[in-house]
Each structure stands twice: as C-alpha cells, then as structure tokens.
C-alpha cells in the first residue's frame, strides 16, 4: 500500500499548477468527504487552474457542480454523480481546464492529457516516443 506522510491540511498548494484526484473506491468517497480537499478543488476552479480526476473521482467534481454543461467521463456506474455533465463514456475527456478519465485502462491516455495541458503537444510526443507508445 501507499502510505502518505502528509495530508491535504499539511500541504501548501499556493504554487501548484494542477490538482489531480486519483480514482478507486473507497478512496474517491474519502476525497469527496474531505472539506479541505473540496475547498482546494473549488479554489482551483475559481482561479481557472487545471483539475484532473480519473475513475470514480470525477464524482467529486460532479458533486461540487464543476461538470455542469461539460463533457466528462468516469468509471461505469458513477455517471449519476456527474451532475449536469454530458457523460461520454470516452477513455478521456478534456473540457476547458478539466480533464476526466474513465478508469485504470485509460491511465496512460489520461496522464498524457495532463501533460499536454501543462506542457503542450510537443512534450506529449516526446514522452510517447521515449515510452514506445504508438497507439494513442
């Protein structure tokens, strides 16, 4: 297991470029219940900073109202929590500064979408070549 040595309360996100919510259960529910994390995500949204969530975690964004009118994707069965979103079922969706990923099988495509948002298409191509990724 991965053990955290800090929690969201003990971190300074002032210079953070992006907040990324990992997927899985019960982790996504735990994230959704954390007031400090919800406030951080809302602050990033207000400041128009990038937000990414994969698997079950897009539900956090949905419950905060951040997906209304946006294309989004999530792990099958969690669509009901993406309030007001157009749930596409695609492996990855980027709508503005928000990236959502469907699940574990979309992890590489999701990661490359995050890199593209932060570093651009040239960096994505460089990484794909270095990792021998040819089918994305």
What are these regions (language model features)?
Residues 76-78:
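Long, charge-patterned amphipathic alpha-helical coiled-coil/hairpin "stalk" segments used as oligomerization
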């Amino acid at each position: 297991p991965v053990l955290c040595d800090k929690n969201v309360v003990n971190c300074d996100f002032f210079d953070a470029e992006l907040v990324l919510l990992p997927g899985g259960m019960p982790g996504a529910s735990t994230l959704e219940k954390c007031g400090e994390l919800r406030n951080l995500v809302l602050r990033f949204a207000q400041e128009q900073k990038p937000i990414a969530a994969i698997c079950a975690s897009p539900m956090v964004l949905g419950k905060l109202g951040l997906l209304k009118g946006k294309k989004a994707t999530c792990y099958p069965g969690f669509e009901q929590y993406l309030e007001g979103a157009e749930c596409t079922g695609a492996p990855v969706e980027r709508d503005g500064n928000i990236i959502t990923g469907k699940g574990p099988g979309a992890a590489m495509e999701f990661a490359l979408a995050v890199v593209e948002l932060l570093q651009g298409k040239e960096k994505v191509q460089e990484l794909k070549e270095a990792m021998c990724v040819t089918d994305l």
